[in-house]
Amino acid sequence: SLDPKIASTLEPRAPTPERRLTAVRRLADAGIPVNVSIAPVIPAITDHEIERLVARAAEAGAQRVFFLPVRLPWEVAPLFRAWLDAHFPDRAGKVMATIQSLRGGRDNDAGFFTRMQGQGPWADLIRTRIAIACRKHDINRERVPLRRDLFRPPRGPQGELF
């Protein structure tokens, strides 16, 4: 979210939206290809910002944008419902109904091809909005080729974690 209040409610200790966009700009200015993840897209809470998020990511120098609709695996679902009731009680029912519509009527869909993108009309709408916004801002045109020539093998044996 670009809204500092929503962003801090979702991720209280994470960098602000502006700091994240500054990081995108600095990486892009240094010649590093940058992808931006718009996640989680939460119906009736963050989905209204999609076009603006794509525009700001493009302005900051991102080459690609992708999205992930909110996922509620296992223990996350009751935590999310409690968070929703605490912060957005006026929309909790609508949010959960929409999430379930893109997850086959359930809070979660662990299917390999559907868990990260969702399915159904709402997921299709978000995909279409992302695609239109990306065309408008001239991003997601092509993938950056992998530069294996930039890889430097370590000088010695790999270190140990423990």
Task: Give the residues covered by each predicted segment.
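Auxiliary Fe-S-binding modules of radical SAM enzymes
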Residues: H48-F162
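Core AdoMet radical
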Residues: S1-V24, P33-S37, R64-L68
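Acidic-and-aromatic substrate-binding clefts and catalytic sites of carbohydrate-active enzymes
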Residues: I42-D47
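Glycine- and acidic
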Residues: A7-T9, A39, G111-M116
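Conserved dinucleotide-binding and phosphotransfer motif residues
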Residues: A30
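Generic structural signal for hydrophobic
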Residues: V24-L27, A57
